[in-house]
Amino acid sequence: MDKIFVEEAVAELHTLQDMLRWTVSRFNAAGLFYGHGTDNAWDEAVQLVLPTLYLPIDVPAHVRESRLTSTERLRIVERVVRRINERIPTAYLTNKAWFCGLEFFVDERVLVPRSPIAELIETQFEPWLTEEPTRIMDLCTGSGCIAIACAHAFPNAEVDAIDISTDALMVAEQNVQDHGMEQQVFPIRSDLLRDIPKDQYNFIVSNPPYVDEEDMNSLPEEFEHEPELGLAAGTDGLKLVRRILANAPDYLMDNGFLICEVGNSMVHMMEQYPDIPFTWIEFAEGGHGVFMLTKQQLLDCADEFALYRD
């Protein structure tokens, strides 16, 4: 960003509303990609500016007329410059992200939370969940946001939060502590299900790496700051999903089910496995590429994935 813009902003903008407006203008001019928790310049500006000032993102309208100190303005401008010049997702600049209305710590060890699975948690997995769950598995937990949101939604359930990345699990553990969930959410290191004892869960929810090779080669710059381990999944994006489908029934109660996100790789799923009765979930709030299979359906198609059993 031109130095003159920076100097003008610090010198001439005075209120919180001034900074929000200026930030939106700069984001629009820069042609940023939005997809890490927001989908427009205004929401992106709110999620950058307010946490930078240690304010909640839902401050009352009259607070936006508050005057800022020059130090506060400079801190905001510095982050705006980094967001534009380095294409760093806002959540990594503020170390804050929101999922299911809950705040989480994030940094470049984990993906920024953005899964449409949030909508399923908020509706308590209706109509598939027919009883109060006692055991839930979040497979490929990353920051722990899905596991923790499930724990909030189902306070009587124990939630195992599984990931292969020790870096990600450190972030998940911090979030578990921040939410006071140490007695309910349990981060566990495992290569998918390989190192997990065969226990019975009401359901497994998974947002694994699923980006195929073609998409990996064309992702916007913002994604370069996220851990590749959490994104890439081979030529067709299904490298890990096949293993999940092969092994998940061993961990489900008889009336259990699997919820799994595959994003754009749903195209490959439908092409390669046309006879599997995936329930592709429609989201009122946007999103796609999430399927549901019951334990019985997984058992019925076990031969399709026998080669991928652990």
Swiss-Prot record:
Catalytic activity: L-glutaminyl-[ribosomal protein uL3] + S-adenosyl-L-methionine = N(5)-methyl-L-glutaminyl-[ribosomal protein uL3] + S-adenosyl-L-homocysteine + H(+)
Gene3D superfamilies reported in the protein's UniProt record: DNA helicase RuvA subunit, C-terminal domain, Vaccinia Virus protein VP39
Keyword Chloroplast applies: no
GO terms under biological process: methylation
EC number: 2.1.1.298
Annotated GO MF terms: nucleic acid binding; protein-glutamine N-methyltransferase activity
Key words of the record: Methyltransferase, S-adenosyl-L-methionine, Transferase
CDD domains with a match to the protein in the record: AdoMet_MTases
InterPro entries: DNA_methylase_N6_adenine_CS (IPR002052), HemK-like (IPR004556), Ribosome_uL3_MTase (IPR017127), SAM-dependent_MTases_sf (IPR029063), Small_mtfrase_dom (IPR007848)
Pfam families, per database record: MTS
Cellular component annotations (GO), alphabetically ordered: cytosol
Function: Methylates large ribosomal subunit protein uL3 on a specific glutamine residue.
Family: Belongs to the protein N5-glutamine methyltransferase family. PrmB subfamily.
Protein name: Ribosomal protein uL3 glutamine methyltransferase
Native source species: Aliivibrio fischeri (strain ATCC 700601 / ES114) (Vibrio fischeri)
